[in-house]
From Swiss-Prot:
NCBIfam families from the UniProt entry: PRK00951.1-1, PRK00951.1-3, PRK00951.2-1, PRK00951.2-4
Domain of life: Bacteria
Gene name in the database record: hisB
Lineage: Bacteria, Bacillati, Cyanobacteriota, Cyanophyceae, Nostocales
Primary localization class, coarse: cytoplasm
Species in which this protein is naturally found: Nostoc sp. (strain PCC 7120 / SAG 25.82 / UTEX 2576)
E.C. no: 4.2.1.19
Entry's Gene Ontology cellular component terms: cytoplasm
Catalytic activity: D-erythro-1-(imidazol-4-yl)glycerol 3-phosphate = 3-(imidazol-4-yl)-2-oxopropyl phosphate + H2O
Name of the protein this chain belongs to: Imidazoleglycerol-phosphate dehydratase
Keyword entries, A-Z: Amino-acid biosynthesis, Cytoplasm, Histidine biosynthesis, Lyase
């Protein structure tokens, strides 16, 4: 068989861009992602710390993100935080499509001063979260640090990825959380890359994800 006999994947003809609009009685969330972006981010969720973390995903994952959200902030940030995770997860899944040709797996170890966090993920089609953060304070600014886990639970379930988060070191809550989002971004960037050697085939011995 000649090299030319293999199907060629023309990346320019396969834009990996998706938009999802989710409206509930509690929130109104619009997310657009471009998996082959340059790290451009527009985030206005009404939760400043979450916006800051979304910028980390975009910048370090080289994923263009536009996240606009309105929610019942007068109650607390929980519903908006969770629904942003849900909608972003759905947008990622939609942009990935059948996941043909992607590397699929990603792993990254991110330091931020004294904090060190490892993230490993698999766009497997099987949602699972193993969460190993020990965040010492209840809040970073006005952000409830319990919501970090809730964000990733929502993201994992709706993108159908397997995600492992391990904290190896860290005493500053902001540093621990930001290192987590940076590690996630770099691991995701690795996993969503198109592998030209796969020539558009699904990265599974089963032939389906």
């Amino acid at each position: 068989m000649q090299i030319s006999d293999y199907p060629q994947l023309n990346l320019s003809s396969v834009p990996r861009i998706a938009s999802v609009h989710r409206i509930t009685g509690e929130t109104n969330v619009q997310v657009t992602v471009n998996l082959d972006g340059t790290g451009i981010c527009k985030a206005a969720t009404g939760i400043p710390f979450l916006d800051h973390m979304l910028h980390q995903i975009s910048s370090h994952g080289l994923i263009d993100l536009d996240v606009q959200a309105k929610g019942d902030w007068e109650i607390d940030d929980h519903h908006t935080n969770e629904d942003v995770g849900i909608t972003l997860g759905q947008a990622l899944a939609k942009a990935l499509g059948d996941r043909k040709g992607i590397v699929r797996f990603g792993n990254f170890l991110a330091p931020l001063d004294e904090a060190l966090v490892q993230v490993a993920l698999d766009f497997s089609g099987r949602p699972h979260l193993s969460y190993g953060l020990q965040i010492p304070t209840e809040r970073v600014g006005t952000y409830d640090t319990q919501l970090v886990r809730e964000f990733f639970v929502a993201l994992v379930n709706h993108s159908q990825m397997t995600l492992h988060i391990r904290q190896l070191d860290g005493i500053n809550s902001h540093h621990i959380i930001e290192a987590t989002f940076k590690a996630f971004a770099r691991a995701a960037r690795m996993a969503i890359e198109v592998d030209p050697r796969r020539a558009g085939t699904i990265p599974s011995s089963k032939g389906v994800l």
